[in-house]
Amino acid sequence: MDIGLFDGFLRQKQYQGKPLRDRLGGWMKTAEVFRGKEIACYHKEWAYFSNRYKVTCVEYIEAKPGIPPTPGHVQEVIALMKQRKIPVLFASNYFDRNQIRQVAQRTGAQAVIVPENTNGAPGVNTYFDLMSTWVNGLASAFKGGAS
């Protein structure tokens, strides 16, 4: 669904006299801060998440899954992130944190490092915990907070 159409639908349609947008809760409400925005991602694993929450991964550090990125590709991603002022680098916690943090630091972006699966970090025991970790991490980064 087009992000503009979705937002327009939520603003225009009402339930009990209030726009649906005012009634959003949970992850969809929290995700409003990053819906329609661009991020860089470490790996293509975020395709379904980015589609569901309408946040675009404009480029990937690891362009070919399972193959470490070349220094040249990393430089291309850094240049793109600087040019487009991409504010967030979204990555799983099993990738090289030093590389993730270096790219974020060199671009002025915030690294949001999260588990990919349940039990991938302390306190992430259920799918609901996992989704909350992802959504809250991105929302915090877009609000200027630490992740």
Can you name each region flagged by the protein language model?
Residues 1-147:
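Extracytoplasmic metal-acquisition and chelation regions
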